[in-house]
Each structure stands twice: as structure tokens, then as C-alpha cells.
């Protein structure tokens, strides 16, 4: 038995010392002559040493050592040799897959931190396929783990639905469908669309204020006191929504979501949000125009679906303190998270006080800053002068002519 144990001991150096000499294996008539190593105790350590070498790809020759022994006796003496084989290259191969798995890229932290986000991301190809549209706020949505703008869009829809995956998927689908049908980017493109100045001039503006150490502060202004004829401005709800969406798209472009280089902290601050100001100076609240009510409700319905988590805060300025009921009504149509962002201010000149000094001074004077008025310092959508077609009034003929015409009939 000792002699039999010696053969695997000798087999270890065979690939290194005897492979160049092709004649030596034929000169070993017996296992006794071919096993000069005297200490059988080395068999087990040697076998143990070959297992890790198989993982590295170098131990695969150990089980093949008995093959060069041509004598049948050597083959018989090598009977214990299968034991290293039973140390099994297969498990070694299995072990080799473990380092391979470790080499795979680790799952992004934003997926491990928010499992629902990963599930939402996995559903994205189906959502895009079903809606037939892949653009959201200027971001081409991609099923790529490293595409940060796409991840941020998904985070906004998921946050807007308090982590409810089904609700987020449903809202994203509706928003994509709306964008496909209305093409809001084109609505904001001055080369493609412009809006009736007699209805919308002075009604909406956009300003962007630079902040030190932070991104730009984007503000949209809705000056309802500038409306001359409410029935004309709000009477055509479809036209009003298009104008309002065009203004919103200009603001979204200023957020630069498509250029994002960092993922939004799901539980933290979102830097890709804007401020909205609604000015009701000279607007009567005693009797709300029904067209205004209808347009307001439709705007809330569309924007709450198509533009979630883009609003940081909304200020209602120059609103009489007794008109608190208006905000109670608005809160019925928006979720609780959005409702918390509403801030009524009775005096518009106090608006700038809500912001840091470096930004506040850049506001127009009417709102507590030192900048010129919005008309001369802000941007707006493309407007056009639309000439009203004069309706020709029927000429009044003499009574005799009218009687003659009636008889002729």
C-alpha cells in the first residue's frame, strides 16, 4: 500500500521534469521503480495543494499523470490516482464561477436602496413598447442601468406615487401617451408654433436665476391680472392648455434633465424642480368665471399627470386673505404632497423674502427685488398678432326693396 501511495507523489513533478524527455515514461517497468519518493506522508498535502491550482487553471495536469505509464502494472498501481480526480475538477470549475460572479458589475446603489425603482426600470421596455413613445421632458428614455437621466425620470414618477409601482407605471404610460399626442416640445418651438397675443400677451413668463453652489433657480410666472377678456383667453380650453404647456416646456428645458450627471436621492432633495408664481392682482374673486374654472381644472388634470415632481413650491400672490377657500378647492384636485407646496401671500412685494438674499434681489421690483419688470426682463412663448376678421353686416335696404324680396320668395 505504501508503494501505491508513492505513485501519485511522484506524479506531481512529472509535467515539469519528464515532459521534455519523451522516452522516460516507457522505461518505468513497475510502480516501485518509478516512485523514488520515500515518504508516503506527503501524499495528502500534495493532493490538497493541487485543488487550488485547478482553480487557477494549472492543476488540471495532476489527474493526467498516470497516463504516461505504459505498463499495465503501473496502471494498476495507479488505482488510487482517481482520488485526486474525485477531488473533482467539476467542483473546482464551480468554484471558479464564484470569482467570475464577483467580477460582474455590482448592482447600483439606487436599485439596492429602492427595490421598487429596479422593478420600475425592468418594466420600462414594456411601457415604451405599449405607448409607442420614448421621450419624456427632453430625455430619451433608455433601458440602460447607467443612463442617469432615465433613472431620474423614473424616480420622479415613483416618488409622485409614494412608491406605488403600479400607479407609477400607469402614470408614466399616460404621460408618454399625452406627449405623443400633443408634442409639447413642438408647442414651445417658436419656429413651429406661436400664440394669439390678444389672448396671452403678458399672461406668462419665465425667469432663470443663477445661484452660487447650486443649480439655477427656474421660475414661471402666471399673471392673471393681465387677462383682458377671460372668455377669450380661457374660452378655448384646448388652445389655453397648448399655450400653458408651451410655457411649461420652456421651463423644463431650463432644468436640463437630459444633462443630469447624478442620480436624485429618492429620499432627499430633488435639484430638478422649479418655482411657480401665480399673481392675482386686480382679479376679482367674488364671482369666478366658469371658463376660468373649467380651464383651471383641466390644467391641473393634465399637469399633475404629465409633469409630476417638477414643482418645488407654488406661490399665490396678491390673494386676499379671505380667499382661503380657493386653495381648499385646489387641494381637492392634487395629491397631499403637492398641496403642501402651496403658499398664499396677500402682498406680492413680500415674495422675495421667501428666498435667499442672493436670489431675492434678482426678482422684479413688484415682488420685492430690484430687477426690472417681467415684460422687459423675462422670457415668454412666441406670440403673434392675429387680425380679427370683420364680419360684414347686412346692408339695410329700403322697406320697399325688402317687401319686394319677400314677394319674390
Swiss-Prot record:
MF terms (GO), sorted A to Z: metal ion binding; phosphatidylinositol transfer activity
Keyword terms: Cytoplasm, Endoplasmic reticulum, Heme, Iron, Lipid transport, Membrane, Metal-binding, Microsome, Transport
Gene3D superfamilies linked: CRAL-TRIO lipid binding domain (3.40.525.10)
Record's bilayer topology term: Peripheral membrane protein
Superkingdom of origin organism: Eukaryota
Region Disordered: start-end pairs: 1-107, 366-409
Compartments where located: Cytoplasm; Endoplasmic reticulum membrane; Microsome membrane
This protein's GO CC annotations: cortical endoplasmic reticulum; cytosol; endoplasmic reticulum membrane; plasma membrane
Catalysis: reaction(s): a 1,2-diacyl-sn-glycero-3-phospho-(1D-myo-inositol)(in) = a 1,2-diacyl-sn-glycero-3-phospho-(1D-myo-inositol)(out)
Keyword match Chloroplast: no
Boundaries of every CRAL-TRIO domain copy: 199-375
Role this protein plays: Non-classical phosphatidylinositol (PtdIns) transfer protein (PITP), which exhibits PtdIns-binding/transfer activity in the absence of detectable PtdCho-binding/transfer activity. Regulates PtdIns(4,5)P2 homeostasis at the plasma membrane. Heme-binding protein that may play a role in organic oxidant-induced stress responses.
Family: Belongs to the SFH5 family.
Protein name in UniProt: Phosphatidylinositol transfer protein sfh5
Gene encoding the protein: sfh5
Amino acid at each position: 500500500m505504501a508503494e501505491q501511495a508513492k505513485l501519485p507523489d511522484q506524479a506531481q513533478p512529472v509535467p515539469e521534469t519528464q515532459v521534455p524527455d519523451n522516452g522516460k515514461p516507457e522505461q518505468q517497468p513497475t510502480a516501485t521503480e518509478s516512485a523514488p519518493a520515500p515518504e508516503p506522508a506527503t501524499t495528502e498535502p500534495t493532493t490538497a495543494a493541487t485543488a487550488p491550482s485547478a482553480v487557477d487553471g494549472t492543476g488540471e495536469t495532476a489527474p493526467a499523470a498516470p497516463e504516461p505509464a505504459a505498463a499495465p502494472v503501473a496502471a494498476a498501481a495507479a488505482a488510487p490516482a482517481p482520488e485526486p480526480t474525485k477531488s473533482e475538477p467539476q467542483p473546482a470549475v464551480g468554484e471558479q464561477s464564484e470569482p467570475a460572479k464577483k467580477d460582474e458589475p455590482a448592482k447600483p446603489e439606487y436599485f439596492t436602496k429602492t427595490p421598487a425603482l429596479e422593478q420600475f426600470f425592468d418594466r420600462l421596455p414594456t411601457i415604451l413598447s405599449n405607448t409607442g413613445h420614448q421621450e419624456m421632458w427632453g430625455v430619451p428614455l433608455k433601458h440602460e442601468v447607467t443612463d442617469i437621466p432615465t433613472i431620474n425620470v423614473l424616480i420622479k414618477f415613483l416618488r409622485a406615487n409614494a412608491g406605488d409601482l403600479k400607479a407609477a407605471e400607469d402614470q408614466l404610460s399616460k404621460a408618454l401617451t399625452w406627449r405623443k399626442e400633443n408634442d409639447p416640445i413642438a408647442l414651445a418651438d417658436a419656429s413651429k408654433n406661436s400664440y394669439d397675443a390678444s389672448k396671452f400677451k403678458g399672461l406668462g413668463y419665465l425667469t432663470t436665476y443663477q445661484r452660487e453652489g447650486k443649480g439655477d433657480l427656474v421660475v414661471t410666472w402666471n399673471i392673471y391680472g393681465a387677462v383682458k377678456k377671460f372668455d377669450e383667453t380661457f374660452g378655448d380650453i384646448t388652445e389655453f392648455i397648448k399655450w400653458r404647456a408651451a410655457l411649461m416646456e420652456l421651463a423644463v428645458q431650463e432644468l436640463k434633465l437630459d444633462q443630469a450627471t447624478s442620480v436624485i436621492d429618492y429620499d432627499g432633495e430633488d435639484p430638478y424642480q422649479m418655482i411657480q408664481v401665480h399673481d392675482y392682482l386686480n382679479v376679482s374673486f367674488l364671482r369666478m368665471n366658469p371658463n376660468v374654472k373649467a380651464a383651471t381644472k383641466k390644467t391641473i388634470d393634465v399637469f399633475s399627470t404629465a409633469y409630476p415632481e417638477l414643482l418645488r413650491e407654488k406661490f399665490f400672490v396678491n390673494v386676499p386673505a379671505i380667499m382661503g377657500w380657493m386653495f381648499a378647492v385646489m387641494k381637492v384636485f392634487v395629491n397631499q404632497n403637492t398641496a403642501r407646496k402651496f403658499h398664499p401671500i396677500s402682498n406680492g412685494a413680500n415674495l422675495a423674502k421667501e428666498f435667499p438674499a442672493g436670489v431675492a434681489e434678482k426678482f422684479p421690483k413688484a415682488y420685492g427685488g430690484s430687477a426690472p419688470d417681467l415684460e422687459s426682463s423675462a422670457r415668454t412663448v412666441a406670440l403673434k398678432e392675429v387680425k380679427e376678421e370683420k364680419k360684414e353686416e347686412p346692408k339695410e335696404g329700403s322697406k320697399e326693396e325688402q317687401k319686394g324680396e319677400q314677394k319674390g320668395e
